[in-house]
Amino acid sequence: MVNPTVFFDITADDEPLGRVSFELFADKVPKTAENFRALSTGEKGFGYKGSSFHRIIPGFMCQGGDFTRHNGTGGRSIYGEKFEDENFILKHTGPGILSMANAGPNTNGSQFFICTAKTEWLDGKHVVFGKVKEGMNIVEAMERFGSRNGKTSKKITISDCGQL
């Protein structure tokens, strides 16, 4: 089985930054990978297109995926509002790791984060389901618009997304 690849085209205050592509580890976490893939294509009638990265902390991560409330309190999965932690096989080994944001055990929705450093303290708490394939330089550019409290100096938006 070939793992799916999806892409995000990123803008900062409507200025194009570029494209980030992700490999989704459907071989290890099929349910979590399928949620992210379908939210990237928008095939269920809702998803990531037009949503923003509401929290970016340089040297840590870029968080997005709240397409319902746009502030980190919302989002929904393709399985209903929330779904369970599939497994913790994969670890937060360094920059480019794609992982699910949550509000505690078994509260996965649509929010996710892209690591910009090794974040091993998140192992066993957040489900890793992918990694940046191309465009880590774009993630680094996004990081420059973040701050220590996570507030962004420009609106970092997923202007387009889909499956490659």
Curated annotation (Swiss-Prot):
GO terms for cellular component: cytoplasm; cytosol; extracellular region; extracellular space; myelin sheath; nucleus; protein-containing complex. The modification Phosphoserine is found at residue 77. Interacts with protein phosphatase PPP3CA/calcineurin A. Interacts with PRPF19 isoform 2 (via N-terminus). Interacts with isoform 2 of BSG/CD147. Interacts with FOXO1; the interaction promotes FOXO1 dephosphorylation, nuclear accumulation and transcriptional activity. Interacts with integrin ITGA2B:ITGB3; the interaction is ROS and PPIase activity-dependent and is increased in the presence of thrombin. Interacts with MAP3K5. Interacts with TARDBP. It catalyses: [protein]-peptidylproline (omega=180) = [protein]-peptidylproline (omega=0). Coiled coil: none annotated. Residues 7-163 form the PPIase cyclophilin-type domain. The modification N6-acetyllysine is found at residues 28, 44, 82, 125, 131, 133. This is Peptidyl-prolyl cis-trans isomerase A.
